[in-house]
Amino acid sequence: MSSKKRSFGDIEFGESDEVGGTNVDVNGEDDFENDDEVESFEDDEQSFEEIEEGGEEGGDNDGEDKGPKKVWRAGVDPLEEDEVLDYDSTAYDMMHSMSVEWPCLSFHPIKDELGAQRNKYPHTMYLVAGTQADEAKNNKVIIMKAKQLHKTKHDDEDSDDDEDSDDDEESDDEDDEDKDVDPELQLAFINHNGAVNRIRSMDQQSNIVATWSDNRSVYIWNIANHLKALDNETVAPKQTAPLHTISNHSIEGYALDWSPKIAGRLATGDCNNSIFVTNASESTWKTDTQAFKGHTESVEDIQWSPSEEKVFASCSIDQTVRIWDIRKPKPAITVKAHTADVNVISWSRNVEYLLVSGCDDGSFRVWDLRAFKDNSPVSDFKYHTGPITSIEWNPYEESQVIVSSSDDQVTIWDFSLEEDTEEFTNANANPDDDFQYPPQLFFIHQGQHDIKEVHWHPQIPHVAISTSIDGFNIFKSSNSEE
């Protein structure tokens, strides 16, 4: 993927756009235009928008029955000038949208001390992101606290319907007593030298964050004071010096990953085919002087092994995925994984021999590392019509991955699903053609433009966050397991 593809296009910032999703085994595609801005914190150019009611043109007309909903397919079905997509809140348990001053190519959820596997609404979460501003001097690392993220399912129902609700809804209210309270977004900033190509927080110490800058430097930051300022609602200093700067790279890059096994171990890959490993010591950081060389074109992504502290994987524009042992400068295994650029990879934390790769041609493949060789994926999916920009295994469901693409879709896939019933076939067939959704396609989220990354939240099961030129979406599909 070229650097031009990685960056946001020349789109005017600040325009409102549409958001929506599809629970593909239940509902049709849903979408609508955001209208209501909710409380912003510290800067009126940052806003939090609650997803509420469907688009005016796309909804029901005087109660007229328009028949079964039909899923709209990005890149396949035309959308006429007088047509809009409908948003149905029942497709989501939760759906919120937020915007900041400049779009963010990359972000990462921050592990917090609020507990793991928390399901009770409203939710609170912390994120860290990096901007792509109009000028290099305007770029920032943004530390975010989003709170009062309440359940939005059935938000578009009339109050009369609420009065008719039964014990089931009363039970829901017990889990979300503050559902009518507006969500809030609090922000803290660090001035950043250059656009942020990628940003990641350390697993073991989430206040330690690494950023890949387009000025060819990798910076390591301590954002502990900024997180504390968000909790205390005070102002943190924007002029914060990095803990360390990695200057070994001769050109900018995008590949960046912290080891889940060794605290302070960071791998970085650049557009000149080089990979460096940095380790933290008691008083400083040390980057190996010898680069890991093997790729013949730009290194696009890196993933450390979830079980082997000295092993990592990388992918490249050279169409390969390579497995490395840091005790050797050359790759241990090289596999031609795709027939185009390999943009992203994810190594499963739950099933340590599974790796998934996303390609510039819109396909993604699942690999069994116990039998890792050329053109031998376990599965090969060719649903998306644009390059895959992000991919990640679900930490709470070993058979699921979430995928984002430049075709303006985020999709959730469940490899445990099979097309084994006539009911499924009939529910997803389009009467106008022979197109059918793959049986493993679990959910479709649409409405954002130029989507760059998507991540699962590590402590709130089945909640996903995506970033695009429009801002961020935080959502949970209604068909997710609790």
Swiss-Prot record:
Compartmental location: Nucleus, Nucleolus
WD repeats: 191-231, 294-334, 337-377, 383-423, 446-482
Domain of life: Eukaryota
Pfam (any one): CAF1C_H4-bd
Protein name (database record): Glutamate-rich WD repeat-containing protein 1
Main subcellular location: nucleus
Keywords: Nucleus, Repeat, WD repeat
GO annotation terms (biological process): ribosome biogenesis
Region annotated Disordered, chain positions: 1-75, 148-180
Biased composition (Acidic residues): 27-63, 157-180
Name of encoding gene: grwd1
GO cellular-component term (any): nucleolus
